[in-house]
Amino acid sequence: MTLGQFGGLFVVYLISVIFILSLTWMEFRRVRFNFNVLFSLLYLLTFYFGFPFTCVLVFRFGVEVVPVQYLLQAMLSATAFYAVYYVSYKTRLRQKTSVPRAPLLTVNRVEANLTWLLLALIAVATVGIFFLNNGFLLFKLRSYSQIFSSDVSGVALKRFFYFFIPAMLVVYFLRQTQRAWLLFLIGTVAFGMLTYVIVGGTRANLIIAFALFLFIGIVRGWITLWMLVAAGIFGIVGMFWLALKRYGLDVSGDYAFYTFLYLTRDTFSPWENLALLWQNYDKIEFQGLAPIARDFYVFIPSWLWPDRPNLVLNSANYFTWEVLNNHSGLAISPTLLGSLVVMGGVLFIPLGAIAVGLVIKWFDWVYELGKNDSNRYKAAILQAFCFGAVFNIIVLTREGVDSFVSRVVFFCLIFGLCLLVAKLLYWLLESAGLIRQRLRRMRATPLAPTPNTVQDPVIKEQI
């Protein structure tokens, strides 16, 4: 990359970032937080945050990168995708109505508490089983890729660890105090550190816990944008340190700076992977929607499907094995746009942008239902569901459409199953006479009795 080429890329980069940041800032000032703001920030992080790191690696350390024309193509396609996405998100599909509708879901106090207990039980039980089978893998494995080897049993259990976070989200949304907010951080980060040590380097639970803590703080006005920036810097440094421990690296001096640059870029902003796909575009055999179906294979236990393929050719594995010819055992993220390119080439990019806009709109609709519901238990469940799905939005931007679809379906099934079981348990307990009504009197300022006033309203709660 020459200085002239860098200058041209920088102009395109600046225009793209200003365009996306302007739209995101307007939305932030309007609503402070919604899933459009979240997706936009994650999109900026994935496709634009890594450009400065790439430039420093090129000019400071002489690292060879993808030819400039493909880097430019990656930037332009990312910006075009966001423009189509934004139009799709903002397009109203039906007229807004103020007519109240009958609630599709009702949740009481007992059901809400049973739901978070079941979610937490799933997470803790699967962590316990994984630990009994494998011990502390962080101190046993020589490389991170060994996690996926036959020596490690119960790898599928890792997918259940995450449900501890939605459980703690329900607890927080039932109270929504600063104390509950801080306890959420302490509990989820402690659990994330435990899973990091047991699994041998999986940082996802830690990243999500910290990110959700920050998002809740922004929504409630407990942290400012400057505090968010400081927390982001702290998070980047923390993730770099954990990556060093994961890969067993001992670095110092210039090499430490070099390692920081490429690990941080690859962790938060694998945008060069999209450029690699454009470079190898003529070699790609478009997979259609097959990667989405194949990604569900990993959720089917081998005892249920004895002939299940051990190697799943989703978009990440296709990119890693067929495009990069990399068989190290780790799948390399193709990004959201990369997965669309693998599935259907250029034509799938605008179609994917429209679909993503509708998905984000749906999450915002559910989130608004939760915020505005008068039943605080139902509101807590809906908001916890939406915030719990943040991990799936991260998967969408970083890993791709196929990984997102399989994980969001899995998340909805487990969350919905826990709520259904909670309702069934409540019905059984109530039928057995173990649920009693708690009468709570609303204290009001004494007023002179009038024919139209009602003294001491009574509210019933199940305990």
Curated annotation (Swiss-Prot):
The chain crosses the membrane at residues 6-26, 39-59, 65-85, 112-132, 154-174, 180-200, 201-221, 222-242, 340-360, 377-397, 408-428. Pathway: Bacterial outer membrane biogenesis; enterobacterial common antigen biosynthesis. It is a multi-pass membrane protein. InterPro entries: WzyE. Its main location: membrane. It holds the Pfam family WzyE. Signal peptide: none annotated. GO terms for cellular component: plasma membrane. Keywords: Cell inner membrane, Cell membrane, Membrane, Transmembrane, Transmembrane helix. It is found in: Cell inner membrane. It comes from the Bacteria. The keyword Cell membrane applies. GO terms for biological process: enterobacterial common antigen biosynthetic process. Probably involved in the polymerization of enterobacterial common antigen (ECA) trisaccharide repeat units. Belongs to the WzyE family. Probably part of a complex composed of WzxE, WzyE and WzzE. This is Probable ECA polymerase. The lineage of its organism: Bacteria, Pseudomonadati, Pseudomonadota, Gammaproteobacteria, Enterobacterales.
